[in-house]
């Protein structure tokens, strides 16, 4: 597994994978690809770094990470559907840890995303908070 720091030229590929991530986690985000590209560009222009995960010369996923004073915030982590169930998510995450030299990482996982919750717990993550939302009609 190789990990590559992304640049602006990677925004289309990152945004495409972000669209799949949104679908897979059944997020309430209804942004179109053009909107996701704009948002990804803003993330990279500001305080986030994105990394591509490469296995056998193929892009298999990505991560979007922000540095915090006490560690890192992993905003997005995605492994392509065609490459799942092969331990590539674990390998990619371990490469990311090495790349960042991270002691602490914070993630968010939607409560109905059972596959995501199971994956993160398998890596040793524990619940640290519960975020709640009120949406008035």
Regions found by a protein language model. Name each.
Residues 1-16:
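A short beta-loop-alpha structural element at the N-terminal edge
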Residues 18-40:
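Conserved GNAT-fold acetyl-CoA-binding loop/helix
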Residues 41-52:
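A short helix-loop-beta-strand connector motif used in the catalytic cores of GNAT acetyltransferases and
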Residues 52, 58-66, 73, 78:
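Conserved beta-strand in the GNAT
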Residues 67-75, 84, 127-128:
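A conserved beta-turn-beta hairpin within the catalytic core of GNAT-like acetyltransferases
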Residues 83, 87-95:
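Conserved acetyl-CoA pyrophosphate-binding loop and the N-cap/start of the following alpha-helix
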Residues 106-117, 133-137:
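Conserved beta-strand-loop-alpha-helix junction that forms the acyl-donor binding cleft
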Residues 121-130:
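Conserved acetyl-CoA-binding loop of GNAT-fold acetyltransferases
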């Amino acid at each position: 597994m190789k990990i590559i720091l992304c640049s602006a030229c990677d925004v289309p590929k990152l945004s495409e994978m972000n669209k799949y991530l949104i679908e897979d986690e059944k997020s309430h985000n209804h942004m179109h690809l053009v909107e996701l590209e704009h948002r990804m560009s803003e993330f990279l222009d500001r305080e986030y770094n994105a990394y591509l995960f490469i296995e056998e010369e193929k892009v298999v996923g990505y991560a979007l990470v922000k540095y915090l004073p006490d560690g890192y915030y992993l905003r997005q982590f995605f492994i392509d559907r065609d490459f799942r169930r092969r331990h590539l998510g674990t390998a990619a995450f371990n490469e990311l840890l090495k790349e960042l030299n991270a002691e602490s990482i914070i993630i968010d996982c939607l409560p109905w995303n059972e596959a995501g919750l199971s994956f993160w717990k398998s890596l040793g993550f524990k619940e640290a908070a519960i975020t709640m939302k009120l949406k008035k009609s």
